[in-house]
């Protein structure tokens, strides 16, 4: 069976730093898509894991750590938080660059809450792990969460929302190889190229087993001329 070269190139696409910088110039820190780009590039999260991150609960600046403990997924028109793929709960180290981005987002979130007041949309996790949003001036007896990505007024940004970001990168920036998973793949490749132990790569990315890591990254690196 002939190989679809375009499909193969799309699947294996690694985003060069210069290209990633160009993407961030289009989606700067003031954009509600910004963190959905910088987190997988720096941590290697899956798209559902990225959007399930809680800025208040999952980030520990004192330990320079980020917890990956869920993924956002949709059933019909409702979004839920469920355990990550393969139940791969993990805590990963983060660097100063990502910490700076996260601190800015947290600060801006607080500013926007004051700006919008009662009209700000707070996000809650219901007992069935579904997500709902309610105006800040309405009291709700459920657990409030702080999603990684929201609009200025608190409106939830989801993996479906990211499709718009990808379309802009495809058509406005002219990068048709870009896709949501490529930033995770790029991070894993950078780790492998940097000589990081395969077991460490496996644990950081939440792979099911070491064979997946070796097949996806290490073999690709050793195959390079």
Question: Which residues fall in each region the model found?
Answer:
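Conserved tyrosine-mediated DNA breakage-rejoining catalytic core shared by Y-recombinases
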Residues: 2, 53-137
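Basic, Lys/Arg- and aromatic-enriched nucleic-acid-binding interface segment
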Residues: 1-47, 51-53, 89, 112
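Generic alpha-helical hydrophobic packing signal
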Residues: 38-42, 51, 65-67, 101, ...
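Extended hydrophobic-aromatic, low-complexity segments
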Residues: 36, 61-62, 68, 77-78, ...
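Catalytic-site neighborhood detector that most strongly recognizes the C-terminal catalytic loop/helix
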Residues: 6, 14, 72, 205-225
């Amino acid at each position: 069976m002939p190989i679809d070269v375009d499909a193969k190139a799309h699947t294996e696409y690694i985003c060069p730093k210069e290209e990633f910088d160009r993407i961030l110039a289009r989606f700067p820190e003031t954009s509600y898509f910004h963190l959905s780009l910088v987190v997988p590039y720096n941590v290697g999260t899956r798209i559902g894991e990225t959007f399930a991150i809680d800025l208040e609960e999952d980030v520990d600046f004192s330990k320079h750590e980020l917890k990956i403990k869920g993924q956002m997924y949709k059933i019909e028109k409702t979004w839920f938080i469920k355990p990550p793929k393969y139940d791969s709960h993990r805590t990963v180290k983060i660097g100063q660059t990502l910490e700076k981005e996260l601190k800015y987002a947290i600060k801006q979130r607080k500013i926007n809450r004051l700006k919008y007041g009662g009209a700000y949309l707070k996000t809650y996790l219901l007992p069935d792990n579904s997500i709902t949003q309610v105006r800040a001036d309405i009291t709700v007896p459920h657990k409030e969460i702080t999603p990684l990505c929201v609009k200025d007024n608190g409106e939830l940004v989801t993996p479906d929302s990211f499709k718009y970001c990808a379309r802009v990168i495809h058509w406005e920036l002219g990068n048709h190889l870009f896709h949501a998973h490529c930033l995770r793949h790029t991070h894993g490749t950078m780790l492998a190229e940097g000589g990081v132990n395969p077991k460490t790569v496996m644990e950081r990315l939440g792979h099911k087993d070491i064979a997946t890591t070796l097949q996806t990254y290490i073999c690709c690196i050793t195959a390079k001329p």
